[in-house]
């Protein structure tokens, strides 16, 4: 059994055969068997829609679909017989995931799944939180609560509130943020910094702090990426509430980054520091000693830094963003040797090509993540280098990082081809991870919406099509961690879980939130509603820009406060002058695209 993704080129109803062409230009003849099923793409919580009786109307030239079937070797070739077909819309150029509300409804469903999985139907009590969640949403017996996974779920719940206005999601985000502050945060008053524990081990009424990482790659060290993602959820919550305690935590954690992780002379940030001296050059760090990597430099922007800037407009955040993006543009490309960026470095930026599991391998999604975030930054601080690198990545990635027959994006591949090889070899497998599909969708959506181009929009649609067809779990809820190359779910080991060290609603929610923003304001040109709930002690200037978007691409059209129209706002700068209040204000804004 295998999958073909492509576009109908012709259909012979009498013979029950149609031709389709893939993104690579290969043509396949598809035989429709009598027991073949056909359906319309559906979202989480939507019913199955049978399309079998409408095949003559739907198998028209240009229709985009997935076909799952069997290749039978026969004669000098093969016969491909379809067993399942999924149509992405009702006619050519029609994509269900571009309809208004698709990603909002998906995020609403995700939030409902994780709310039930972690807290059941009762009160929200983070003492019950578990890092590992089974396929069906059942909590495991593991009592280690990892800081980053809580923060990632908080991010998801905050994002769900921003799109739906459901107070329950904000309650979960705020309680999670407070739980992180109360249990996972260490305040070093002597050095005026904050850092975050790896997690806590909960046993009855007792908890044991886990200061250093328990993850194999980072064991007994303080990795930069764990400190970064500890800020993800609280920062997204800060955008909604303006809670000054959160902004203080952001600034004090950034002081940790500047004082102990930053390489002031050489540029960038080190990936790990030791837990005693807080030094990146201590021998106890072993293979992580004096190293820099993608996470330590590139993950600041999407995890918290862009959102901190959106919430405040403060120059210190923009300046750090510019520094990190300048560093990426200067040191990460390696196009004389590979179509993939290099991701690991020594202090002097020479390439570390033998580091643990990665060696000289590329994480496909990190390349796409660079393109996506460069285009975000380019809207605030335009630079030719940012735009050029983002466009280059967008152009060269599909043939080396994506599946040209089945759709979707691969995981980890060798950066170099050996003599005689035509394809970059897979590191371990040809499976496809949910978060890498997210990077592709967002990268090509923002490229399509900013620099334009039919190719970018086509790549965005193909990536979103694969994700929505194969990653949504219509039986248990939420999304799968990994699928096989064909799109079938891969349900072994930790990849069977819906919650783990690597998965806790963050990437799936980020995708829903930003796909809504980019699709509405840049692609289909539809209004976008967002919700905020600033505290009485928050700044009286509420910034409601949904992301770093090109100047003049949207404006603030309407504002409601506590359900009533409110007129004191700046349409062009997307800010609201809040009235004084002794209570939190419920603010709903509508943003509209500007042609």
Predicted regions and their residues:
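Glycan-recognition and catalytic cores of secretory/periplasmic carbohydrate-active enzymes
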Residues: 1-595
């Amino acid at each position: 059994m295998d999958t073909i993704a492509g576009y109908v080129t012709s259909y012979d109803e009498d013979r029950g055969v149609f031709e389709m062409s893939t993104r690579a230009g290969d043509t396949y003849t598809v035989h429709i068997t009598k027991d073949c099923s056909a359906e319309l793409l559906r979202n989480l919580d939507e019913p199955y829609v049978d399309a079998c009786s409408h095949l003559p109307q739907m198998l028209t030239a240009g229709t985009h679909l997935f076909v799952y079937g069997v290749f039978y070797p026969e004669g000098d070739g093969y016969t491909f017989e379809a067993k399942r077909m999924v149509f992405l819309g009702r006619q050519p150029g029609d994509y269900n995931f571009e309809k208004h509300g698709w990603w909002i409804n998906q995020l609403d469903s995700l939030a409902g799944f994780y709310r039930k999985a972690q807290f059941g139907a009762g009160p929200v009590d983070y003492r019950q939180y578990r890092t590992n969640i089974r396929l069906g949403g059942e909590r495991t017996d593991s009592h280690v609560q990892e800081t980053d996974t809580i923060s990632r779920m908080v991010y998801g719940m905050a994002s769900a509130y921003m799109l739906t206005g459901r107070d329950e999601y904000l309650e979960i985000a705020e309680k999670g943020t407070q739980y992180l502050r109360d249990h996972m945060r260490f305040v070093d008053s002597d050095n005026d910094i904050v850092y975050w524990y790896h997690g806590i081990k909960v046993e009855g009424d007792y908890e044991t702090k886990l200061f250093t990482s328990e993850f194999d790659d980072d064991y007994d060290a303080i990795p930069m990426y764990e400190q970064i993602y500890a800020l993800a959820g609280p920062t997204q919550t800060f955008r909604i509430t303006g809670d000054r305690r959160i902004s203080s935590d952001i600034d004090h954690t950034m002081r940790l980054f500047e004082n102990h992780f930053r390489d002031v002379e050489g540029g960038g940030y080190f990936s790990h520091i030791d837990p005693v001296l807080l030094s990146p050059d201590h021998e106890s760090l072993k293979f992580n000693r004096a190293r820099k990597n993608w996470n330590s430099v590139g993950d600041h922007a999407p995890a918290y830094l862009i959102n901190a800037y959106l919430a405040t407009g403060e120059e210190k955040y923009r300046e750090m963003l510019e520094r990190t993006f300048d560093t990426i543009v200067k040191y990460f490309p390696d196009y004389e040797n590979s179509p993939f960026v290099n991701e690991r470095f020594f202090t002097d930026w020479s390439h570390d090509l033998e580091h643990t599991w990665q060696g000289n391998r590329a994480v496909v999604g990190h390349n796409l993540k660079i393109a996506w975030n460069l285009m975000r930054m380019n809207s605030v601080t335009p630079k030719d280098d940012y735009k050029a690198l983002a466009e280059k990545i967008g152009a060269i990635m599909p043939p080396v990082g994506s599946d040209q027959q089945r759709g979707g994006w691969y995981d980890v591949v060798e950066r170099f081809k050996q003599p005689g090889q035509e394809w970059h070899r897979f590191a371990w497998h040809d499976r496809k991870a949910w978060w890498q599909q997210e990077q592709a969708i967002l990268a090509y959506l923002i490229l399509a919406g900013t620099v334009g181009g039919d190719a970018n929009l086509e790549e965005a649609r193909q990536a979103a099509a694969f994700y929505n067809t194969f990653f949504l779990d219509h039986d248990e809820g939420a999304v799968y961690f990994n699928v096989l190359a064909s799109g079938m779910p891969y349900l072994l080991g930790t990849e069977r879980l819906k919650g783990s060290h690597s998965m806790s609603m963050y990437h799936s929610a980020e995708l829903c939130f930003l796909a809504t923003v980019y699709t509405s304001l840049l692609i289909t040109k539809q209004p976008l509603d967002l919700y905020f709930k600033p505290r009485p002690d928050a700044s009286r200037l509420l910034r409601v820009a949904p992301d770093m978007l090109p100047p003049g691409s949207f404006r603030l059209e309407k504002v409601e406060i506590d359900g009533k129209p409110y007129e004191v706002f700046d349409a062009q700068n997307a800010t609201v002058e809040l009235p004084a209040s002794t209570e939190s204000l419920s603010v709903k804004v509508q943003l509209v695209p500007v042609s």
